[in-house]
């Protein structure tokens, strides 16, 4: 029986844990697959994806900085991908790529089921407005948060995200210079790559953003999450959570789309958490 081919596309992508995660999912479910990492700069992504399809690729994950490009290349889109304006999962069907976004479902599943958080009624600060932020914002709204404030270094992108979400009563954008005026939040989500340079000062955020219930969540993991989580602990956030659980859960969502079966994420998460020192950055 031929082995089906899958891949994760990104730039850079050598650090990605997705090949290890999907290989373990395959072993667990008895599904034979070949899953590799393919480095593709933005300008080469379309051609690289076409080569992958020509060579028999059945599905792909997409990480930074290609999620919005994947959205544009998909022939059809799921509702959640359309709302996000970004794609992290591609399914090959009848010679066409179908785009989906499992990031938000992965984040909410990790926060509610693994971390035990009730997201209902929380006021949320979302840092960033790129593909990662777009992927999680709709799912957070669906989970029952009260309000979301989007802050991004480029205000135009924050405005565009808010417009796309279409819930002006719950979602607003503010300038990064306004952080001290925003009050406190029960959930602060870092959807930026500002920690990639390991700059401890990258997250000199006002302490007034934090209250006694605040959960601070970085969508990154490993070294890239260190600066934000260090701020969260110094600010005495009740929870400081990295993106490893989200990574595993969104991968399980993608796996289910491709294979029709959802794997058990707990053993894979536990194994990766035990290797935490070697983790680098987020998918």
Curated annotation (Swiss-Prot):
A Pfam family annotated for this chain is: Shikimate_DH
Identify the NCBIfam families for this entry: aroE, PRK00258.1-2
InterPro entries named in the record:
Aminoacid_DH-like_N_sf, NAD(P)-bd_dom_sf, SDH_C, Shikimate_DH, Shikimate_DH-bd_N, Shikimate_DH_fam, Shikm_DH/Glu-tRNA_Rdtase
Q: Which Gene Ontology molecular function entries are recorded, alphabetically?
A: NADP binding; shikimate 3-dehydrogenase (NADP+) activity
Name the enzyme's class.
oxidoreductase
* Active site residues of this protein: 67
Q: Where does NADP(+) bind?
A: 79, 128-132, 243
Superkingdom of the source species? Bacteria
Q: Which reaction does it catalyse?
A: shikimate + NADP(+) = 3-dehydroshikimate + NADPH + H(+)
In the UniProt record, does the keyword Heme occur?
no
EC number(s) from the headed UniProt entry: 1.1.1.25
What would be the name of the gene that encodes this protein?
aroE
UniProt function note? Involved in the biosynthesis of the chorismate, which leads to the biosynthesis of aromatic amino acids. Catalyzes the reversible NADPH linked reduction of 3-dehydroshikimate (DHSA) to yield shikimate (SA).
Pathway(s) of this molecule:
Metabolic intermediate biosynthesis; chorismate biosynthesis; chorismate from D-erythrose 4-phosphate and phosphoenolpyruvate: step 4/7
UniProt-recorded name of the protein: Shikimate dehydrogenase (NADP(+))
An annotated GO cellular component of this protein is: cytosol
Species of origin: Xanthomonas euvesicatoria pv. vesicatoria (strain 85-10)
| Keyword terms | Amino-acid biosynthesis, Aromatic amino acid biosynthesis, NADP, Oxidoreductase
- Which GO biological process categories is it annotated with? amino acid biosynthetic process; aromatic amino acid family biosynthetic process; chorismate biosynthetic process; shikimate metabolic process
Residue spans crossing the bilayer: none
Belongs to which family? Belongs to the shikimate dehydrogenase family.
Q: Where does shikimate bind?
A: 16-18, 63, 88, 103
Q: How does it assemble?
A: Homodimer.
